Amino acid sequence: MGKLTLLLLAILVWLQYSLWFGKNGIHDYSRVNDDVAAQQATNAKLKARNDQLFAEIDDLNGGQEALEERARNELSMTKPGETFYRLVPDASKRAQTAGQNNR
């Protein structure tokens, strides 16, 4: 019985080593799970960005309002007959704002 017990103990030790440290063991499993979680988080961010871009494309294809708003905000364009006014804060307010931002 001593040899059989020793053999079974050796097999148990080998199986435990394979489970914890071997290829496709617990360490590899946890690393892959972490990689999967990180990839799923990245995919969720990219999906949200794609959804936002698709909504913007639909707005631009669907109507003139979105196109007009974008032209006004990003390119400072105006319609014929309109006057563009830019409001610039006075120098004392700009100095106060700059002083607060430097703190």
From Swiss-Prot:
Positions on the Cytoplasmic side per record topology: 1-3
Domain of life: Bacteria
Keywords, in A-Z order: Cell cycle, Cell division, Cell inner membrane, Cell membrane, Coiled coil, Membrane, Transmembrane, Transmembrane helix
Protein family according to the UniProt entry: Belongs to the FtsB family.
NCBIfam families (UniProt xref): PRK00888.1
Described function: Essential cell division protein. May link together the upstream cell division proteins, which are predominantly cytoplasmic, with the downstream cell division proteins, which are predominantly periplasmic.
Protein's name in the database: Cell division protein FtsB
Species this chain originates from: Escherichia fergusonii (strain ATCC 35469 / DSM 13698 / CCUG 18766 / IAM 14443 / JCM 21226 / LMG 7866 / NBRC 102419 / NCTC 12128 / CDC 0568-73)
Upper taxonomic lineage: Bacteria, Pseudomonadati, Pseudomonadota, Gammaproteobacteria, Enterobacterales
